[in-house]
Amino acid sequence: MDTGVSSPRVLVVDDDSDVLASLERGLRLSGFEVSTAIDGAEALRNATETRPDAIVLDINMPVLDGVSVVTALRAMDNDVPVCVLSARSSVDDRVAGLEAGADDYLVKPFVLAELVARVKALLRRRGATATSSSETIAVGPLEVDIPGRRARVNGVDVDLTKREFDLLAVLAEHKTTVLSRAQLLELVWGYDFAADTNVVDVFIGYLRRKLEANSGPRLLHTVRGVGFVLRMQ
């Protein structure tokens, strides 16, 4: 059923076609409408014509680099939130990006789940949130507090590592939806992670032992030949 609520629109800009396609898939899977551009000039045209809710922008691009794009947008009084992506991690580079008008600066390589969280944070500041960004998500006795990065079962905190929580957060935001191993690898471990690894299965096992301890109800389900889903039995 059409609820009449549109998803936030994100413009993704990167001159690497593989990276661009991966980021587009990941953001779409996370509940955003996504448009793309392969260089700074195209990004500037797109941003001016379509007015996205947020922009994810690589720094190093041909024609017009990312800092120049941000500077041009701000000169036109366009205050769209911008998250800059860069392999440059020095303080001077970060300061240059932020002083040009960027709202956030994310150093490559990064985990896709972190980018999604940063985009959602930028959108919250403008009052636009993705449909999947509930503050606390409940599945049976499990409560997942995404902003606070806390998980509770029957009101008791569950001690999770950073990666375990990242995986749980993605599953919670897509509860009742079966996600493939490839989708989880992309969302949690990043687009450059080896696709033939069994790391997803290993971390699903870790989560099961912690979330379903003491004969608790089954929450994490394996759908044979497809992937994994978070839901009550």
From Swiss-Prot:
List the Pfam families. Response_reg, Trans_reg_C
Q: Which SUPFAM superfamilies match?
A: CheY-like (SSF52172)
Q: How is it modified after translation?
A: Phosphorylated by PrrB at Asp-58.
Keyword Cytoplasm belongs to the record: yes
Under Gene Ontology molecular function, one entry of this record is:
phosphorelay response regulator activity
Indicate where the modification 4-aspartylphosphate is found in the sequence.
58
- What is known about what this protein does? Member of the two-component regulatory system PrrB/PrrA that is involved specifically in early intracellular multiplication of Mycobacterium and is essential for its viability. Upon phosphorylation by PrrB, functions as a transcription regulator by direct binding to promoter regions of target genes to positively regulate their expression. Autoregulates its own expression.
Q: What is this protein called in UniProt?
A: Transcriptional regulatory protein PrrA
Organism for this UniProt entry: Mycobacterium leprae (strain TN)
Gene that encodes the chain: prrA
